[in-house]
Amino acid sequence: MDKLKFGLVSLGCDKNRVDSEIILGSMNRDYEIVNDPREADVILVNTCGFIESAKQESINTILEMNKYKEKYNCKMLIATGCLTQRYGKELKELVPEIDAILGVNDYKSLDDAIEDFFNLGKKDIYCNYSDQSINEGKRIITTGEYSSYVRISEGCNNSCSYCIIPKIRGKYRSRQFENIIDEVRELSENGTKEVILIAQDTTRYGVDLYGRKRLHELLKEMSLIQGIEWIRIMYCYPEEITEELIEEIASNEKVCNYIDMPIQHISDNILKNMFRKTRKSEILDKVEKIRKKVPNIAIRTSLIVGFPGETEGDFNELCDFVKDANINNLGVFRYSREEGTKAALMPMQIADTVKEKREEDIMLIQQQVSKNLNAKKIGKVYKVIVEGFNGDYWYGRNFEMAPEIDGKVFFKSQSEIKVGSFINIKITENLEYDLIGVVYNEFSK
């Protein structure tokens, strides 16, 4: 078989992106990886199946990629990821255009699937539904060499009533401590300066392997690696955040004063029905404890509106929390009724129009909160990692901003700027979510 050109489309979360990077890095054949699907002989779509809108986007993307079989060079279309893990057999019947289907842990079967198709004309499902391994190995980084996601565990042991992820990704499995450190060391040698730790629950790291939580130890060891300047923590469960973790964030200059702590709601009634392990008082106490120890910390959270049984009172309580808590970065999801979850069977399902209105109301409140917080930053100087140039402004992020989901810092400069470098920016103007500034002491001697 001649050398094939291989294209990949990655949908969904940053954990899916890591899977895609491992897929690209693990292929045994000498493929040529291309960015333009018009050039590809083989196109793989790494799907998301978390909520209904993500499932629909995945199917639409698969059908869109099939057009390249009709009009261009593509001869084989492959689907993998959460959607295929959840609906592999049904997907084969629903979308016959797919030539091979792989589950979330089946990337090692990719070469076989391609060989079978081109040599034997075979179309098949390559899903090992009992595989509880962790996708690890060489990666081809797609986020720019200066910033890389590092997954520290796979799966989830929480049983939130709205979430299908444990059934797709399996039980919680921590990666070996040494493997993670080796990966970060290799990333650093290849130019990575910012490491973003991800998992379904980063704060539980180590419990299954070592009998104790070791996230704070992981941070300490990573910070010793030369070249790593920022370490950012995502997906922290409030009840799993330890004193040791807070102390490490406060004392370790390489660990960003940033924590992503999805709480989903603040009403005890809704939290109970979500099967969440924390209640309002515990969440408020945790936020206060973190801020007391790390005064300038940026807190990100995510919320779900329109959960079954969410009354006007529950929603107003959530609105009051958003107004008062001064959360730096916030995302809102409309509840999605997912088959196979406990919440899907609950009474008092909320109409889509109500969900949409509640999402809009929360984001309007947060927009003003964010604008007020940003106004206090005028005149301050921040270390910013440079991400690019949009034709008018250079842009990047300070420690308060995770890539893609938070705001940006925009600035102009008459000097030569290198993407991936750090630069000091003095803030001169604030927007709702973004900041505008100038290079600090650009022309000073």
Curated annotation (Swiss-Prot):
Its cofactor is [4Fe-4S] cluster. It is found in: Cytoplasm. Gene3D superfamilies: Methylthiotransferase, N-terminal domain (3.40.50.12160), Nucleic acid-binding proteins (2.40.50.140), tm_1862 like domain (3.80.30.20). Residues 375-441 form the TRAM domain. Keywords: 4Fe-4S, Cytoplasm, Iron, Iron-sulfur, Metal-binding, S-adenosyl-L-methionine, Transferase. It comes from the Bacteria. SMART domains: Elp3. GO terms for biological process: tRNA modification. Binds 2 [4Fe-4S] clusters. One cluster is coordinated with 3 cysteines and an exchangeable S-adenosyl-L-methionine. This is Ribosomal protein uS12 methylthiotransferase RimO. It comes from Clostridium acetobutylicum (strain ATCC 824 / DSM 792 / JCM 1419 / IAM 19013 / LMG 5710 / NBRC 13948 / NRRL B-527 / VKM B-1787 / 2291 / W). The lineage of its organism: Bacteria, Bacillati, Bacillota, Clostridia, Eubacteriales. The gene is rimO.
